[in-house]
């Protein structure tokens, strides 16, 4: 089963639409230069009103370790996503089971480099200029297939209701992460596009999932709470 995360949530109404229609996780961006930045105090109030089964992911870009930990506790986050230039030594400051590391061809996402990181999963996104994701550009699916062969993979980068089924079919990621592809403006999600993405993923699963696959033990889940804390 392909898991689904919607990122860049800024409004409770959008978050509830995603959660109530089956999203596995929601992402909150704590990078002040992002148009989808959400102050920790506002994020905390929003998160408190979410259904308990939804996983809360905090997205950080080149932030001080202690600041990440502070926001993690203030907001009641479940997982931490590092979306900047954080090196393996920085990442080791966090328990691997609760860490998602975003990578892109520009920041050296080859298999040899990935071996140096300890994390729950890699998130493949497209980076343009000084922007750390959320650009709407399609990521490198060939690289995604290579990463998927060895690591749990979240596929991001330009996904929307029209192409998410094709992306899953080509890359076979453990999860997909959608941001600008379901927006009417940065940080403002379109409820119908959210529902359309979720419906498209369900259609794919219904078409591709065989009886034999249903009998297999459930595979590793990325969006799941862990016993690890920071």
Curated annotation (Swiss-Prot):
UniProt GO molecular function: phosphoribosylanthranilate isomerase activity
One of the protein's GO biological processes: L-tryptophan biosynthetic process
Source species, domain of life: Bacteria
InterPro entries registered for this protein in UniProt: Aldolase_TIM (IPR013785), PRAI_dom (IPR001240), RibuloseP-bd_barrel (IPR011060), TrpF_fam (IPR044643)
Membrane-traversing stretches: none
Pathway linked to the protein: Amino-acid biosynthesis; L-tryptophan biosynthesis; L-tryptophan from chorismate: step 3/5
Gene3D superfamilies assigned to the protein according to its UniProt record, in alphabetical order: Aldolase class I
Protein name as catalogued: N-(5'-phosphoribosyl)anthranilate isomerase
């Amino acid at each position: 089963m392909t898991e689904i995360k919607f990122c860049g949530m800024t409004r409770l109404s959008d978050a509830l639409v995603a959660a109530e229609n089956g999203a596995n996780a929601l992402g909150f961006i704590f990078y002040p230069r992002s148009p989808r930045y959400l102050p920790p105090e506002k994020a905390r109030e929003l998160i408190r009103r979410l259904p308990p089964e939804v996983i809360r992911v905090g997205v950080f870009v080149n932030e001080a370790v202690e600041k990440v930990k502070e926001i993690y506790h203030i907001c009641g986050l479940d997982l931490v996503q590092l979306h900047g230039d954080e090196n393996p030594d920085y990442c080791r400051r966090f328990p691997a089971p609760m860490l998602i590391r975003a990578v892109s061809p520009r920041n050296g996402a080859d298999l040899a480099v990935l071996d140096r990181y300890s994390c729950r999963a890699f998130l493949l996104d497209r980076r343009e200029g000084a922007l750390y994701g959320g650009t709407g550009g399609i990521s490198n699916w060939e690289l995604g297939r290579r990463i998927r062969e060895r690591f749990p993979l979240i596929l991001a980068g330009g996904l929307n209701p029209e192409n998410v089924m094709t992306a899953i079919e080509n890359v076979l990621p453990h999860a997909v992460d959608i941001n600008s592809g379901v927006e009417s403006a940065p940080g403002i999600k379109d409820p119908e596009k959210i529902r359309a993405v979720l419906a498209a993923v369900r259609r794919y699963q219904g078409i591709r999932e065989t009886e034999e696959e249903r009998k297999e033990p459930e595979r590793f889940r990325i969006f799941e709470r862990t016993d690890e804390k920071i």
